[in-house]
Regions:
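Positively charged n-region of N-terminal signal peptides that target proteins for export
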Residues: 1-3
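Hydrophobic alpha-helical bundle signature of multipass membrane enzymes
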Residues: 20-193, 217, 224, 233
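N-terminal signal peptide c-region/cleavage motif recognized by signal peptidases
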Residues: 12-16
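Short alpha-helical patches at coil-to-helix transitions and adjacent helical residues
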Residues: 157-162, 201-208
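C-terminal subdomain of the subtilisin-like protease fold in secreted/lumenal serine endopeptidases
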Residues: 203-205, 210-211, 216-236
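Short acidic/histidine-rich active-site segments
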Residues: 196-199
Length: 236
């Protein structure tokens, strides 16, 4: 199995996470190409983009709710993977960590490392302007210097966030409703902070589902899933 240093990158963003070395379940060249699956992002003069603008303004209204804004800003974190995964702690019913839940942690980290590269090609190809850039707005999260000039379509946070929900719901199916609800809100946080258009987010959920489907055909993924399920049952 090929080992990777843990990097999620579409320049200029590079994030290193812990000493854990992910092992991908499927090689990148075997993954479906999102350029041939997802539609192109809406043109700025299209009815679909008008809907994106409506949702952008919805997001700005949501910022007026200090509690929801705090959630959206916290959801923007990607520098510490354990912090990220524990955005699902309440929905999942327990904390997730490399030390305390190593099998669950490994399942998630390896799944993300496998599927996340799918977004790189369409991001570079479309290089879609982000909402905060188009409207010369200021983002409420810390990401603005890193995101400026980097394509918005599809959304990496949303792809990973929806994938995390899909995987955790396999581990703990009795908590699926809460897990999916958390993932849905996590993805929408990207609209609220002005990092992404709604169409970025919606198509990223589809992209995550495509990647999740690929994982189901991996013997290594299925074997690790069983370990994670047993660990979950022993700790709940």
């Amino acid at each position: 199995m090929r080992k990777l240093s843990f990097l999620f990158a579409v320049a200029p963003i590079v994030v290193k996470v812990s000493a854990f070395t992910p092992e991908v379940y499927v090689q990148a060249e075997q993954l479906p190409r999102l350029l041939y699956i997802l539609p192109a992002p809406p043109a700025f003069d299209s009815p679909e983009f008008a809907a994106d603008e409506v949702r952008y303004n919805w997001g700005k209204v949501q910022r007026q709710d200090s509690a929801r804004l705090a959630v959206a800003v916290a959801d923007a974190e990607w520098d510490n993977l354990e912090v990220v995964l524990n955005r699902w702690q309440e929905a999942f019913g327990m904390p997730i960590s490399e030390v305390e839940t190593p099998q669950i942690y490994a399942l998630l980290v390896n799944a993300i490392a496998t599927v996340d590269p799918m977004r790189v090609e369409p991001k570079a190809f479309y290089h879609r302007q982000r909402p905060f850039e188009r409207y010369e707005d200021t983002m409420p999260s810390h990401e603005e210097p890193f995101l400026r000039g980097e394509g918005s379509y599809p959304s990496g946070h949303s792809l990973r966030g929806w994938l995390i929900g899909l995987v955790l719901a396999q581990v703990a199916p009795e908590r699926a409703e809460a897990i999916y609800a958390r993932s849905w809100d996590y993805c929408n946080s990207r609209v609220i902070v002005g990092a992404h258009w709604q169409s970025d987010v919606d198509n990223s959920r589809t992209a995550a589902s495509v990647g999740f489907g690929v994982l189901q055909n991996s013997n290594r993924y299925r074997a690790q899933l069983i370990k994670a399920q047993l660990e979950y049952q022993s700790k709940k």
